[in-house]
């Protein structure tokens, strides 16, 4: 494991900045940053921004100087790099384009489409969200694309699956005292509030299907021949099958979503969720989903469960 730093070349705040990364572990990177006295606010998803006047000090503490190109190459190889499209400003542009494409070739009013998409994205960017945010929305949409390219069926209307992805966490209160599935029920109600606007020209049967799919994400248990449900469920659970480092980021973000819950209550509730997932049948219901993510997901879930019990 190595902490790397590139030359200061990124201008901001009257100086230039280097990037400080680890080629193996975010835990290693954070530990190094704490020891060096770097502010947590300097961390940006996969790196710390370091002003030029501190670079020599960090090299003396053990950071290895490399070129910018080498730093990016090794960060990407580690699996820790957060793609540029996932950063907020670029991500939101990508999402807006994806939303607009769902209405291309229909009778929908462009202004109504833009307004509905903007309102939905505002919900996804609420300040209390850490995991259930636009990055998760984009990941689900990209996973739907991946599964479709790999041969998974989308059901009778591929647009319905993608619309359901947009709505599946559109309402997210994160209230542990609420009945199970309340957020999904409220999100399904939002489907009907938004998509029945005649200016969006969404057929009634598509609205019904989108609402059904959103409700399904409460349990992730689609019926055996529910192709659309299987695709959306698998895309929503894709995060479980990522690398151990990416999975750790997911768990940390979910914990932030429940920061108001005590550690003891978190461990108890999270343990129950993990047990239910581990005791279930296949986590993924499409053949491509099982092939790509099942084994890694079970390793990640088992490792987290063991850590909670330690």
Say what each PLM segment does.
Residues 96, 100, 114-118, 141, ...:
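An amphipathic alpha-helix signature
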Residues 113-121, 134, 138, 158, ...:
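Short, well-structured alpha-helical segments
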Residues 123, 184-223, 275-277:
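Histidine- and acidic-residue-rich, metal-dependent catalytic cores
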Residues 125-160, 186-199:
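Alpha-helical phosphate/pyrophosphate-handling elements in metalloenzyme active cores
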Residues 140, 158-176, 187, 212-218:
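His-Asp-centered metal-binding catalytic motifs of divalent-metal-dependent phosphohydrolases/nucleases
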Residues 77, 82-102, 131-132, 142-157, ...:
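Divalent metal-dependent phosphate-bond-processing catalytic cores, especially two-metal-ion Mg2+/Mn2+ enzymes
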Residues 9-66, 70-72:
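Basic nucleic-acid-binding interfaces
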Residues 114-144, 170-176, 284-285, 289:
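Active-site flanking loop/helix segments enriched in acidic
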